[in-house]
Amino acid sequence: MTTPLDTPTREPLPLAPAGPGKLVMSAPRRGKPPRHFVDLEPAERGPAMVELGEKAFRGKQLATQWFERLEDDPARMTDLPAASRTRIAEALLPTLLTPIRTLTADGGTTIKSLYRLHDGALVESVLMRYKNRDTICISSQAGCGMNCPFCATGQAGLTRNLSTAEIVEQVTAASRALARDEVPGGPGRVSNVVFMGMGEALANYKSAVAAVRRLVSPAPDGLGISARGVTMSTVGLVPAIDKFAQEGIAATLALSLHAPDDELRDELVPINQRWKVGEALDAARRYFEATGRRVSIEYALIKDINDQAWRADRLGKLLNARGRGWVHVNPIPLNPTPGSKWTASDPAVERAFVAALENRGIPTTVRDTRGSDIDGACGQLAAIGPEQPRA
């Protein structure tokens, strides 16, 4: 039975318990990761070499090896003095991510990597090869403090923030695998980076934004990825969105909305209790005005919870009230998570939801979900170690 667009009903909300985490904005204090060359701003690299007794220009040489040539073996960095390589590596190239498990799907073109950090914390990233691009979904925190009840990461709670280098190294590790032809499809290089893995990136603002700068800065200062290929996802930290808009980077902003009404979003996305739907959308519009980059609205479709056509219509009205041509909606079929009783919307309901948005003139594309069979899709990253049983 369908509900007319103009007669919304109040459904009971069979929401999951809050789980182990509450809404956490500040990461727990833990020992800092060792300083890595990637943590240094370009202007700091020469002085760091001088501290080691080397010439300042060695900083640029090391940057060329790391970012441009994707070299991680000091023995092959032949433009650095052989007698200095070990000392430089020990001081500036500590191991940050230790791979402990790799799972593949889609004929080997979707790869989920589980890494152990220096303190035992676990994070995951997912590399996805498409015909015209190579995209990696990366983590900005170990765990997440946003406590969204339909997301495996949010239910795990927040362990700690990642450093700039820990974030970037997920990308360089994937780029090395592509460059060395270790992934089906021939040699390649990461072209797109989405901050949609574990964590709320804007809650780890300093490290996440510094990581974006390393990604988009031309080699040898960084990896030289186009800012258009970088997507910063957020549940709606309004002050941080406004701050990011002024960074001069012009990456794509993705707002994880999941409901157009405060009553439901308060439950699905607890940060909404601090910044309401209207405030988040206003900030997203300001981001568009500051950067010229069209904003993506992410909307996980949950059966009988938020997938009603009238909610799509309400969302369309809210977006159009803030102008035309500034936004695109990505409905996402809900991916299953361990212990969750929620499921994805029926295909007919999904089509009706999309049609309601399109009837309001809102560009809408259902997200191509990959990696769900290896718990590598949106909302599924939980960094379960090899020794931990799956639910």
UniProtKB/Swiss-Prot annotation:
Binds 1 [4Fe-4S] cluster. The cluster is coordinated with 3 cysteines and an exchangeable S-adenosyl-L-methionine. One of its GO terms (biological process) is rRNA base methylation. The keyword Metal-binding applies. Its main location: cytoplasm. Specifically methylates position 2 of adenine 2503 in 23S rRNA and position 2 of adenine 37 in tRNAs. It is found in: Cytoplasm. Its cofactor is [4Fe-4S] cluster. Residues 130-373 form the Radical SAM core domain. Reaction proceeds by a ping-pong mechanism involving intermediate methylation of a conserved cysteine residue. The active site is at E124, C378. Gene3D superfamilies: 1.10.150.530, Aldolase class I. Keywords: 4Fe-4S, Cytoplasm, Disulfide bond, Iron, Iron-sulfur, Metal-binding, Methyltransferase, rRNA processing, S-adenosyl-L-methionine, Transferase, tRNA processing. InterPro entries: Aldolase_TIM, Methyltransferase_A, RNA_MTrfase_RlmN, rRNA_lsu_MTrfase_RlmN/Cfr, rSAM. It comes from Kineococcus radiotolerans (strain ATCC BAA-149 / DSM 14245 / SRS30216). Its EC number is 2.1.1.192. It catalyses: adenosine(2503) in 23S rRNA + 2 reduced [2Fe-2S]-[ferredoxin] + 2 S-adenosyl-L-methionine = 2-methyladenosine(2503) in 23S rRNA + 5'-deoxyadenosine + L-methionine + 2 oxidized [2Fe-2S]-[ferredoxin] + S-adenosyl-L-homocysteine; adenosine(37) in tRNA + 2 reduced [2Fe-2S]-[ferredoxin] + 2 S-adenosyl-L-methionine = 2-methyladenosine(37) in tRNA + 5'-deoxyadenosine + L-methionine + 2 oxidized [2Fe-2S]-[ferredoxin] + S-adenosyl-L-homocysteine. Disulfide bonds join C137-C378. GO terms for cellular component: cytoplasm. Residues 12-21 have a biased composition (Low complexity). [4Fe-4S] cluster binds at C144, C148, C151. HAMAP family: RNA_methyltr_RlmN. Belongs to the radical SAM superfamily. RlmN family. Residues 1-33 are annotated as: Disordered. This is Probable dual-specificity RNA methyltransferase RlmN. It is an enzyme of class 2 (transferase). The keyword tRNA processing applies. PROSITE patterns: RADICAL_SAM (PS51918).
